[in-house]
Design a protein with these regions (language model features):
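Short, surface-exposed loop/turn motifs that are enriched in glycine and acidic residues
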Residues: 81, 104-111
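A short glycine/serine-rich beta->alpha loop
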Residues: 59, 104-105, 170-172
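Short alpha-helix boundary/capping elements
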Residues: 57, 61-62, 82, 99, ...
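Portal/gating segments that form or line small-molecule/metal binding sites
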Residues: 77-84
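Catalytic cores of Mg2+-dependent Asp-rich isoprenoid enzymes
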Residues: 1-52, 63-69, 73, 87-95, ...
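Acidic/His metal-coordination segments adjacent to aromatic residues that form catalytic metal sites
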Residues: 94-104
Length: 215
């Protein structure tokens, strides 16, 4: 999860208002799904609630959204340029992985699809280059976020290991101008893993350099 001031910074890098609105809508959806998992004590109930979100997103492909602000924003700002509700629904499916009893490598990879799909969809809507490492960055971003919230040291270490590798590969590439908001998210996640504190000038300076150079 990206803190609000850094969200505003990332949005400033989006290539136009429409791309920024799409990313904001995807963040709002991801926040809602995270809240669903966080406030669920019974895995079965959590699965039912996440499945509701998945099904509601899929239904947007054939019907207007219900009176729910997150779904309305997705329908208005995300479902264009070939992006479907079914594709967005895969983000909700990925969150279901956290309801498993044990977060092994397979489960972590399944959860990482949360970030992969979010980055790929946001990249499509921003006009990012096919060469931008969206999947790697999304995987690393999702698992870096997860690692910071896990209480089991072994599970946190597993998430961190996969995230570090994915983010290192994503950071080694030069991002297109239209992909740099997402590249900035990857760099911020990498600094989270490195323990660079929120609000540090190092964080702002790093993403500013990325905005200017794509690196």
């Amino acid at each position: 999860v990206i803190a609000e001031p850094e969200r505003r910074l990332v949005l400033a890098y989006a290539p136009g208002a429409a791309a920024g609105q799409a990313l904001s809508a995807l963040w709002a959806l991801d926040d809602k799904l995270a809240e669903t998992v966080r406030t669920t004590s019974e895995p079965m109930l959590g699965q039912i609630r996440l499945q509701w979100w998945h099904d509601a997103l899929v239904k947007l492909d054939g019907a207007p959204p219900p009176a729910e602000p997150v779904l309305e924003a997705v329908a208005r700002d995300v479902l264009r340029d070939g992006v479907t509700g079914a594709a967005v629904g895969e983000i909700a499916q990925a969150w279901q992985a956290l309801l498993q009893e044990e977060l092994d490598a397979v489960t972590l990879k399944a959860f990482a699809q949360r970030g992969v799909r979010l980055f790929e969809i946001a990249g499509t809507l921003a006009g990012a280059s096919p060469a931008d490492p969206l999947a790697l960055a999304g995987e690393g971003w999702a698992l870096a976020d997860l690692a910071g919230g896990l209480s089991d040291p072994r599970e946190a270490a597993g998430a961190r290991m996969i995230a570090e590798q994915a983010l290192a590969e994503a950071a080694a590439r030069r991002w297109s101008r239209n992909g740099r908001a997402l590249g900035a998210m990857a760099h911020l996640a990498r600094m989270d893993l490195a323990g660079v504190p929120f609000g540090s000038p190092r964080r702002t300076g790093r993403v500013l350099w990325h905005r200017l150079t794509g690196k």
